[in-house]
Amino acid sequence: MTAVLTAPFIPIAKNLSSHRAAQGVIYADQLKQAGIDLYVNMSLDRYVEDHNTFDTMYVYHGNDWSGHLNLFGGLKEFPHVDNFLNFSKFKGKVYSLIIDFPDYYEQLKHKVDLANSKNKPIDPRWNQVDWNNIIRMQNEAETITPNLLKVYPNIAIGDSHAICMYRPEWINYSMPFKTLHGALKMGLHTFIKPCDHDFENVEFYFGNIDVRHHLLRQPDPVAATKELVREYTRQALGVAEMYNSTVTLYELLPIENEKRHIPKTGWYEKTPFYGSRVERDNIRRLFKEELKKYECSSLRVFEWVDGLINEHGELDFKYMEKPQSVHLSREFYPHWQGWEWNGLNPPINKPVKVHHASLESFI
């Protein structure tokens, strides 16, 4: 093993229910598809302290990098100082995934020096960080995009939920906070990076945010939903023709119980959602029914969520990321779960009770 994929601050969680870890593991799998043999440095028993065990490092900066560090607990109580300390000692070749290597030196070293000069309490391990080597890593790191390391015949595109669409031999583009309405204003075709080849399959998965926050704010939510789907399918058919491909549109996730805690990053207009659970689920089901009206040989609807619904008609918490937020746990992705990256064997499949819903409330 000569390469490692790691995160500089919070270690990649071994727990399959982590949305943040899932994106890192997907990058690892894409690197593997490109012929790179590597290990994902995870928490618990999957953690390798000496990063110099490896020759090459691929740095995952998280799926929510905003450009600024937010250390939970600050310099005094941040619980993962050891991980950054170990990270700082790596002497080999460094690749930065997706974004240019951030200037962690600039964002941290001054704060450490200032705290020391004022005798403010900090974790003493910050003073053991190899800051000169952090500068070297920043200056020498080469930025790469795993999606573009080889030519793939298939592409899946969507908002932050779209990472669940991943499987080997697929490009996977996930754009957090992107609504279907916003995607359509930009044009679905604009999300397919310029390529000199056609795609056999193109998939889109937008709309969950529209249902959660926007459609029920419209004067006529039913009419707004129908119009949104009409434009969605019109543009999807245009993509099918443009790339000589079959386009698949994903049905949306069921609605979870309203007691689910949603981090403020997922709020809009100071609320975690707009409309009751039943109202939003009615819109979700209408969305699916409208999608199916436009099915044809080049436009398909991927129906996949019935097994995630509990006896109350809700998206069951056990299928979701833990301990909070709105995404699925990787364990329940529809195509690929990547058990092997966690050193696990997939469980024997057990039948899941399917609950069918209706549109009675619209009749």
Where in the sequence are the language-model features?
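Oxyanion-hole/transition-state-stabilizing segment in secreted/luminal serine hydrolases
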Residues: 58-71, 192-226, 253-262
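Active-site segments of SGNH/GDSL-like serine hydrolases
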Residues: 95-105, 205-210, 237-279, 303-310
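Serine-esterase "nucleophile elbow" of acetyl-processing enzymes
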Residues: 3-7, 11-33, 105-201
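Extended catalytic core of nucleotide-activated donor transferases of GT-like folds
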Residues: 41-116, 137, 145
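Histidine-centered active-site loop/cap adjacent to the catalytic His
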Residues: 128-143, 291, 315-363
